[in-house]
Amino acid sequence: MEIGLTHYLTVGAILFGLGAFGILMNRRNVIVLLMAIELMLLAVNINLVAFSVFLNDLTGQVFTLFILTVAAAEAAIGLAILVVYFRNRGTIAVEDINMMKG
C-alpha cells in the first residue's frame, strides 16, 4: 500500500479541523488558543508540502519554511507578551484580556 496525496490531505484536514475546534471550543485560556492556531498552521504546511511533492515543484516547500519561521517568531512573541501580562495582572484568562479594549 502506497501513501498518496489523499492521505496527506486527509491528515492536514483533520489537523486543521482540530485546530478550528480548539479555537471555537476554548474561549478561556490564551495558551490553548495559541496552540490551536499553531496546529492549523501545521496542517497548512502539511498540505503545502504534499502538493509540492505531488507536483514536483519546490515552491510549496519554500513557503513552508517561511511559514515555519513566521510561526516560530509568532509563538515566541506571543508567549513573551503573555508572560509579561501574567506578571502584571496575575491571570491570562481571555475575559480579562478583553477588558483591556477600554
Curated annotation (Swiss-Prot):
It is found in: Cell inner membrane. It comes from the Bacteria. One of its GO terms (biological process) is ATP synthesis coupled electron transport. Its EC number is 7.1.1.-. Belongs to the complex I subunit 4L family. It catalyses: a quinone + NADH + 5 H(+)(in) = a quinol + NAD(+) + 4 H(+)(out). Gene3D superfamilies: 1.10.287.3510. PANTHER family: NADH DEHYDROGENASE SUBUNIT 4L-RELATED (PTHR11434:SF21), NADH-UBIQUINONE OXIDOREDUCTASE SUBUNIT ND4L (PTHR11434). The gene is nuoK. NDH-1 is composed of 14 different subunits. Subunits NuoA, H, J, K, L, M, N constitute the membrane sector of the complex. NDH-1 shuttles electrons from NADH, via FMN and iron-sulfur (Fe-S) centers, to quinones in the respiratory chain. The immediate electron acceptor for the enzyme in this species is believed to be ubiquinone. Couples the redox reaction to proton translocation (for every two electrons transferred, four hydrogen ions are translocated across the cytoplasmic membrane), and thus conserves the redox energy in a proton gradient. NCBIfam families: PRK05715.1-2, PRK05715.1-3, PRK05715.1-5. Keywords: Cell inner membrane, Cell membrane, Membrane, NAD, Quinone, Translocase, Transmembrane, Transmembrane helix, Transport, Ubiquinone. Its main location: membrane. GO terms for molecular function: NADH:ubiquinone reductase (non-electrogenic) activity; quinone binding. It holds the Pfam family Oxidored_q2. It comes from Rhodospirillum centenum (strain ATCC 51521 / SW). This is NADH-quinone oxidoreductase subunit K. It is a multi-pass membrane protein. GO terms for cellular component: NADH dehydrogenase complex; plasma membrane. The chain crosses the membrane at residues 3-23, 31-51, 66-86.
